Amino acid sequence: MTLQQEIIQALGAKPHINPEEEIRRSVDFLKAYLKTYPFLKSLVLGISGGQDSTLAGKLSQMAIAELREETGDNALQFIAVRLPYGVQADEQDCQDAIAFIQPDRVLTVNIKGAVLASEQALREAGIELSDFVRGNEKARERMKAQYSIAGMTHGVVVGTDHAAEAITGFFTKYGDGGTDINPLHRLNKRQGKQLLAALGCPEHLYKKVPTADLEDDRPSLPDEAALGVTYDNIDDYLEGKTLDSAIAKTIEGWYVKTEHKRRLPITVFDDFWKR
């Protein structure tokens, strides 16, 4: 088995999908989990206004609405969480995503004060954060807020990770990578677009340039610029296509280098890192 085949198998990626079937699969998956643990009453998700959180949010709201109708349990709710750092540059996109999703409840937690307080506490301890590490602080603060909300609403935190992010480890460890349930796992980036199109999402929300937008020195830095490859490259790789060797090497390099992000904390029984 080639490394490409190994990666595709590990991430559950498929070269072709039926969008309607995958929508149903994700919604039923979320419903089944909640039905298995009836003490859970909410799905909690941070909404940024980008493709991934818009899709995960819509699927979550669909799952909650269907389950509420089926069970008569009106305590069930989907909570969309706005998590700006100060003023969000693409505020209108976030509002448009909320309008599309129609969540049961919308909360806004501005993380800037908490991040600055953490940065100051570290500074007083003699640790001066780089802009990159401050970006990771933002991602982790967002997840901290979501887990606090989930803890107070008997909920689980929904993730937005998908195959095209997982393969490169393009997420913050214990930040946006630290979630309870990931309904998009297995899908590549273009397949996510197909699901949103089938759901009637406004095109500008899934055709916009993807960005984590975590760094102050490089605001709205495109994911593709940070990775050195395009999402089309990554999607082609995940679909089993043959790529230019340099591009394939870059993608595989990211996969190997970030394997620790896709694992639980390393123990003496683990040997994946020795490859």
UniProtKB/Swiss-Prot annotation:
GO cellular component, one term: cytoplasm
Chain residues that bind deamido-NAD(+): R140, K173, D180, H260, K261
Annotated EC: 6.3.1.5
CDD domains in the cross-refs: NAD_synthase
Pfam families the record matches: NAD_synthase (PF02540)
Annotated positions binding ATP: G46, I47, S48, G49, G50, Q51, D52, S53, T160, K189, T211
Assembly and interaction partners: Homodimer.
Similarity annotation: Belongs to the NAD synthetase family.
Protein name: NH(3)-dependent NAD(+) synthetase
Organism name: Salmonella paratyphi A (strain AKU_12601)
Gene: nadE
